[in-house]
Amino acid sequence: GRRRMLVAGAVLMALAGLAFAFTSNLLFLVIAGTIGVISPSGNEVGPFLSIEQASLSHLIPPGSRTEVFAWYTLTGSLATALGALFAGVVTQALQRSSMAPVASYRAIVLLYAFLGIVLGMVFTQVSALVEVNHGPDQLQQTSTGNLLGLGKSRNVVLKLSGLFALDSFAGGFVVQSFAAYWFYLRFGAEPKTLGAIFFAANVFAGISALLASRLAIRIGLIRTMVVTHLPSNLLLIAIPLMPTLPLAVVVLLLRFSISQMDVPTRQSYTMAVVEPGERSAAGGFTGVARTTGAAISPLLAGFLFAHPALINIPFYIAGTLKVVYDLLIYFSFRKLRPPEERP
């Protein structure tokens, strides 16, 4: 069931935090990070997202779906912002109190493990109404011949998954941890400064999600995804062209003020164009595709960041690939409208 999967994911999250706190074995850390939903971007990469999206879509009417996803995105962005600010401030405070840098980072991942335990306790209180066998939109169970729970929606989900993998592959070059490292390498920004920068960035991103739902009502989900995501990717390319820290921060904040407007619309669109009984499977497929895409590019980005002359290249690669993604998703899905947009 969905509730049990959410609790299991929270337990894995806690175990991964403990692993990062108490071992330095690289192989073990890679395994723990993979199964324990540790994200270098600060955004969701584990099982929670797909299950939560399917559960929300299961409970709310189509006309309210995008607005609910916007609030869902806002809540997540604000939590990410507070986490970035807290981690930066606490880490620097611990280091100034004579604690070694590695020990200060260990304190943060221990807190991560504790929050995983708290999250698991919260998930045990989730209503049984989120399960597939509840609610008016229940469909017949998919046959065993279907692709891991996908029947009629298979072609749409596979195509979306491929495009989402491309977008995440591009984003993996400039996840927030890499972007923070770039600000450190390029301008010597301290942890406290970096925490403040990404606190503001995530607040901007969260607020923009609410605007996305309003825009989607006017021009549709696919158009909203593209007209907001495309200029944000041009701003991404412009960040390394800025000569000073303040200018680079301004461009970064401008980008974040529109870059996440495609998130609630993308989530809403995915849940809208698949069969209700296949939403969990669709969320899982697209989630795995995004995670897989995002897992590959940091290897390449790490190589580029290891060479001072190449630290700007990840921004150019990411921005260009994301522009390609925007064009592909528009021309591939502009004619497939969600139910609430059909005449």
Located regions from the model:
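Helix-to-loop junctions at the C-terminal end of transmembrane segments
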Residues: 1-2, 91, 208-221, 305-306
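Hydrophobic core of transmembrane alpha-helices in multi-pass small-molecule transporters
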Residues: 15-17, 24-47, 247-261
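Transmembrane alpha-helix termini and helix-breaking/packing motifs in multi-pass membrane transporters
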Residues: 81-103, 181, 185-186, 296-316
